[in-house]
């Protein structure tokens, strides 16, 4: 009996984590969002095979310059030279007065918010994304810079939390590259390229190195007025 308890104590669990629960998915149209190696609370929507992001998600995580007018059901975006406008449920958009086709519905609106096609957002924003299925999820990146990485030395489990009794999120094959989030002596918190954030035994990781993630997005430049003298902003009070 004692021996059996000891064996049970040191035997790794084979239980797998319910991924819908892990990502907070409640319907087939929900899309989990992983932004800069963090599973965020808000969800995207899958409509006719295309990913849409809520207006709030776009503003908070990707580009605060989009503006949704719920009264007119119009999405607007301003560049240095252009005003872009999109009517809800339309596949067309206008750049100033020129109408262009996007090839799919750009904005889906309901009573509470608007959902914007992710590819339309990307057209005007500095981020990268990859979409995965089983379950539906999008991995977003817009935090550019250096990251610490290491490869799995052998096929091994990535668990929900540190500890051999924690459920398995996914498996990492030998030589799978992982991003190190929180190194530890026994367990290390890692992120996979396809959107799992969990823990791996530290002795299953190879030597760490640094990789640089960069963007090829060309940001637009806004012109501004410059003067070679000071401008007096004092208010003039007129008494009648």
Feature locations, PLM:
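Generic detector of intrinsically disordered, low-complexity, polar/charged segments
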Residues: 46, 192-195
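Short aromatic-glycine-enriched beta-strand elements
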Residues: 186-189
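Short beta-strand elements that form the blades of beta-propeller/WD-repeat-like
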Residues: 231-233
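A short macromolecule-binding patch
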Residues: 194-204
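Primary recognition of N-terminal secretory signal peptides and signal-anchoring hydrophobic helices
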Residues: 2-184, 203-229
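Conserved small/polar residues in nucleotide/adenosyl-binding loops
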Residues: 238-240
